[in-house]
């Protein structure tokens, strides 16, 4: 199983935990990362994630995400096909970087693309993403720990 976590997921454990939903999602993300680290699934990286890491002004968040992605097994490159998919997704109102993340996951044929950006999640679930299922962290936890 291959899992692609977008940047909002990867940074969720660093967000303000006083909000219940954020706390629960953060715990879910930590569980997903541990599950991948235990060898139960492959965590994917991408040039889009690396771009966002490079431009992150918060050292602690940057270090946390770099550590999480250091265990990834594959980095999706920005091929012509990825760029075309991203442009296609963008035509449906999905932001540029979000489109690129989704395109990277679909191109890599990830089993799951996970985001905690609920506006993006709603739009992405309406897209044709082939075998890649678009999920929230809580939906993904239900899959890996039924």
What do the PLM-derived regions correspond to, one by one?
Residues 2, 10, 17-26, 91-92, ...:
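Acidic, PIN/NYN-like endoribonuclease modules and their adjacent C-terminal/linker elements
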Residues 4-57, 70, 75, 138-142:
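PIN/NYN-family metal-dependent endoribonuclease catalytic core
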Residues 9, 49, 82, 100-101, ...:
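Alpha-helix capping/helix-boundary segments
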Residues 14-18, 81-90:
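Short, basic, glycine/proline-bearing loop/turn elements
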Residues 34-37, 65-69, 126-129:
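Short, conserved catalytic or adaptor-binding loops enriched in Gly and charged residues
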Residues 51-55, 94, 119-120:
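Acidic, metal-coordinating catalytic cores used for nucleic-acid/nucleotide bond scission
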Residues 62-86:
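Helix-adjacent hinge/juxtasegments
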Residues 77, 96-99, 115:
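Short beta-strand scaffold positions
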């Amino acid at each position: 199983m291959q899992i692609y976590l977008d940047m909002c997921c990867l940074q969720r454990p660093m967000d303000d935990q006083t909000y219940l939903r954020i706390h629960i999602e953060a715990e879910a993300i930590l569980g997903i990362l541990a599950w991948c680290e235990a060898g139960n699934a492959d965590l994917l990286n991408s040039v889009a994630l690396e771009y966002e890491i490079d431009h992150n002004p918060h050292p602690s968040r940057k270090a946390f995400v770099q550590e999480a992605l250091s265990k990834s097994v594959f980095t999706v490159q920005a091929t012509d096909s990825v760029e075309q998919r991203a442009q296609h997704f963008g035509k449906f109102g999905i932001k540029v970087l979000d489109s690129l993340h989704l395109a990277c996951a679909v191109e890599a044929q990830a089993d799951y693309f996970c985001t905690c950006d609920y506006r993006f999640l709603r739009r992405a679930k309406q897209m044709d993403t082939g075998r890649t299922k678009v999920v929230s962290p809580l939906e993904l936890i239900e899959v890996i720990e039924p």
